[in-house]
């Protein structure tokens, strides 16, 4: 009780001294005149060439002209953007996400049930409350279109909302997954996955979605142990037939060779995952090619589960910057849940190997599909445990690179192929006259370096000009959470990133402990190197304005756990001062 009283006293003692003022302006500009980007290098995904010294004219939300600068005259009243030395590419598409999932530890209770720690209802509320943040992160990563391949009926309301939201990608969605299996513990009022028991129920679930105008239909083709895939094939066929009869493409979750082959033979248009149990043979590849099947490999999603369940992470600076810090933080919670968790993550390391055999199979199958001329589309399955919204897309592209795809092939998979795969190529996916103006102005050539987010100078979404550096302005609490995540990952560079160069650390009596970021680096680098199992848990947090007070509890193998209170003060978007209380 005394500790909480100390926190309460500190909380209010710091408020008058450090009030936060919002001085930020709008991160976007809605032009009232044409926009003309001149002398720019256009990444042409149709010819697979970079066209030098081009001019692109935008009026309202559409591209009205593209061509050599010497041949295109800017409209008299145009807003001119000098693209000299810059590269213009189409906005990217993550073709496999889920709005109803947060990416955190508690978002799939059918896979990991931890309701006694953090309820599924709380996770679902968090997703709804933080939708704007997640969507801004997609834009910041250069993703101007997202495709939700299955969720509750509320997906349709989200699509409508995002359609009128400036700082958000365009969304294409469907409703509940038509499933051969009912996973436990998910929302029963507006279920994201619905088991159908016969052909008529499958048709009825397709029909139920029709008034909402789904962009496609999704089937979850799951075969349980001891069950034959043919047993539920009539259900799959019925759903496909009903969808096609209503002019809708069908996406199918079928990760096994047998279910994938049966689904394709039944008329499936899009496989939303890799086949991971068997190498694709020539018969299968020819079947996929002849049926014009779209292949979305989702290479990183199972790795996210494996790394979370074993607590073996490989976070990058990109992950720390572009992931929502609170959801990224939750996936390290297994290190302090102890007996509340259904398993010991240390023992899980004997079960889950990183990389897994399935990972190797998926990489091989992606390369085979690409070589066979099958339309490959980039997608992450973002929202699943350990697969963070927005940030995971770059990791997916790098995994595709690891599979042996060229940068051009990957860029196509993230742009024009996605548009073609979902029947949107007349409006999206390339920089051509008449198409929607979803564009990325880059400082460097993406054909040479796929790290697109780090290179973005300007985002144009439906003709609106957006400044990426203003999309992710972390709150004081988010900054503190970012450094906590990096502390637990023992990543010194990411840990120091939220701190100001002149940061000062004090004890409770005001004695200066550390001054400046470089001194912090020396102090904490050694600490991280000597503490492989370091983990800090937040027992209580209070936030007001730019002051954050954490009650912390830290564990290190071989040492007695220790606790304390840290008071963080944020100024000009950085942590400037920290007071420690042992």
Region roles according to the model:
Residues 1-23:
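Bacterial Sec-dependent N-terminal signal peptides
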Residues 506, 511-512, 518-582:
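A beta-strand edge to alpha-helix "cap/lid" segment located at domain peripheries
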Residues 128-157, 168-176, 214-224, 249, ...:
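Divalent metal-dependent hydrolysis catalytic cores, especially in the metallo-beta-lactamase
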Residues 204-227, 275-403:
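Active-site neighborhoods of metal-dependent hydrolases
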Residues 87-162, 258, 262-266:
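Metal-associated gating/positioning segment near the N- to mid-region
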Residues 489-506:
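Short, well-ordered alpha-helical segments enriched in acidic and aromatic residues
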Residues 21-22, 27-29, 33-34, 42, ...:
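Histidine-rich, glycine-flanked metal-binding segment
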Residues 24-27, 42-55, 68-71, 388, ...:
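Acidic, glycine-enriched loop/beta-strand segments at the rims
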């Amino acid at each position: 009780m005394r500790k909480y009283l100390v926190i309460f006293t500190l909380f209010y003692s710091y408020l008058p001294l450090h009030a936060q003022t919002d001085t930020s302006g709008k991160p976007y500009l809605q032009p009232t005149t044409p926009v003309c980007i001149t002398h720019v290098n256009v990444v042409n995904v149709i010819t697979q060439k970079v066209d030098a010294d081009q001019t692109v004219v935008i009026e309202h939300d559409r591209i009205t002209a593209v061509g050599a600068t010497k041949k295109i005259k800017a409209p008299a009243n145009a807003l001119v953007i000098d693209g000299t030395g810059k590269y213009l590419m189409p906005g990217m598409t993550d073709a496999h996400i889920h709005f109803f999932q947060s990416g955190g530890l508690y978002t799939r209770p059918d896979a990991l049930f931890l309701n006694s720690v953090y309820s599924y209802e709380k996770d679902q509320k968090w997703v709804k409350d933080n939708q704007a943040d997640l969507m801004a992160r997609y834009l910041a990563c250069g993703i101007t279109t997202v495709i939700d391949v299955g969720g509750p009926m509320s997906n349709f309301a989200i699509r409508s909302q995002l359609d009128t939201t400036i700082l958000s990608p365009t969304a294409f969605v469907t409703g509940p997954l038509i499933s051969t299996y009912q996973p436990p513990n998910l929302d029963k009022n507006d279920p994201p996955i619905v088991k159908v028991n016969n052909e008529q129920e499958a048709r009825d679930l397709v029909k139920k979605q029709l008034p909402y105008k789904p962009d496609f239909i999704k089937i979850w083709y799951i075969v349980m142990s001891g069950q034959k895939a043919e047993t539920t094939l009539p259900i799959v066929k019925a759903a496909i037939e009903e969808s096609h009869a209503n002019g809708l493409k069908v996406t199918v979750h079928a990760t096994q060779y047998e279910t994938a082959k049966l689904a394709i033979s039944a008329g499936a248009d899009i496989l939303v995952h890799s086949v991971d149990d068997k190498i694709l043979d020539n018969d299968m590849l020819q079947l996929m090619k002849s049926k014009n099947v779209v292949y979305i490999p989702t290479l990183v999603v199972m790795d996210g589960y494996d790394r979370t369940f074993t607590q073996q992470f490989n976070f990058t600076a990109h992950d720390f910057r572009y992931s929502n810090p609170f959801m990224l933080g939750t996936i390290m919670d297994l290190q302090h849940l102890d007996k509340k968790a259904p398993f010991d993550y240390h023992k899980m390391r004997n079960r889950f190997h990183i990389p897994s055999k399935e990972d190797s199979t998926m990489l091989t199958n992606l390369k085979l599909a690409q070589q066979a001329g099958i339309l490959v589309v980039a997608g992450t399955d973002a929202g699943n445990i350990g697969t963070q919204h927005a940030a995971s897309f770059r990791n997916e592209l790098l995994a595709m690179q690891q599979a042996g795809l060229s940068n051009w092939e990957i860029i196509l998979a993230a742009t024009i192929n996605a548009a073609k795969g979902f029947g949107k190529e007349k409006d999206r996916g390339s920089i051509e006259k008449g198409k929607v103006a979803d564009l990325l102005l880059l400082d460097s050539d993406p054909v040479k370096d796929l790290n697109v987010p780090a290179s973005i100078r300007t985002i144009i979404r439906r003709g609106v000009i957006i400044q990426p550096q203003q999309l992710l302005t972390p709150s004081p609490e988010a900054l503190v959470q970012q450094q906590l995540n990096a502390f637990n990952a023992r990543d010194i560079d990411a840990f120091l990133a939220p701190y100001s160069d002149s940061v000062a650390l004090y004890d409770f009596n005001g004695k200066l402990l550390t001054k400046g970021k470089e001194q912090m680096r020396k102090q904490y680098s050694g600490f991280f190197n000597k503490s492989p199992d370091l983990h800090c848990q937040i027992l209580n947090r209070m936030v007001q304005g730019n002051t954050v007070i954490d009650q912390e509890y830290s564990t290190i193998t071989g040492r007695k756990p220790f606790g304390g209170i840290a008071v963080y003060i944020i100024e000009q978007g950085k942590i400037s001062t920290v007071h420690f209380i042992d």
